[in-house]
Curated annotation (Swiss-Prot):
GO terms for biological process: ribosomal small subunit assembly; translation. The gene is rpsG. This is Small ribosomal subunit protein uS7. Belongs to the universal ribosomal protein uS7 family. GO terms for molecular function: mRNA binding; rRNA binding; structural constituent of ribosome; tRNA binding. Keywords: Ribonucleoprotein, Ribosomal protein, RNA-binding, rRNA-binding, tRNA-binding. The lineage of its organism: Bacteria, Pseudomonadati, Pseudomonadota, Gammaproteobacteria, Lysobacterales. One of its GO terms (cellular component) is ribosome. Transmembrane segments: none annotated. Disulfide bonds: none annotated. Part of the 30S ribosomal subunit. Contacts proteins S9 and S11. One of the primary rRNA binding proteins, it binds directly to 16S rRNA where it nucleates assembly of the head domain of the 30S subunit. Is located at the subunit interface close to the decoding center, probably blocks exit of the E-site tRNA. The keyword Cytoplasm does not apply. The keyword Cytoplasm does not apply.
Length: 155
């Protein structure tokens, strides 16, 4: 833990093409090894694929993120030698981060031939409440529901 207090939250500039801060964050999450131009090609390529079927791709991405974002998650809490999975509510910034991470991970596991197509297919599925990312959210919610008895261990 840092002794100097928490670092201030850095702001993310909106992306140049759509002017959306959410899309800019999404691009940063897709990025690997600092290759932002590659990440931009992937995200914008996916949005072009979505644009063929749905005229407003930014809204569809937002809807997909809202559908995937978890309301609760479980955190491990050690009490007297036993470790309990305690359900806790997820704060909004973490909700979006988890939603993006799960969408990207699910897209990478898909069978389509290019990453933009994989990401577009996963976003379309998530906007219609199906796909791997939605399955991950349901699994997280199920875990929280199963461990509801330990909710009083919240900190």
């Amino acid at each position: 833990m840092s002794r100097k207090g928490s670092t201030p939250q850095r702001t993310v500039l909106p992306d140049p093409k759509h002017g959306s801060e959410t899309i800019a964050r999404f691009i940063n999450m897709v990025m690997q090894s600092g290759k932002k131009s590659v990440a931009e090609k992937i995200v914008y390529g996916a949005m072009d694929v979505i644009g063929e079927k749905n005229p407003n791709a930014v809204e569809l991405v937002q809807k997909a993120l809202d559908n995937v974002a978890p309301a609760v998650e479980v955190k491990s809490r050690r009490v007297g030698g036993a470790t309990y999975q305690v359900p806790v509510e997820v704060r909004s910034s973490r909700r979006m981060a988890l939603a993006m991470r799960w969408l990207i991970d699910s897209a990478r596991k898909r069978g389509e031939n290019t990453m933009p197509r994989k990401l577009a297919a996963e976003l379309l599925d998530a906007s219609e409440s199906r796909g791997g990312a939605i399955k991950k959210r349901e699994e997280t919610h199920r875990m929280a529901e199963a461990n509801k008895a330990f909710a009083h261990y919240r900190w």
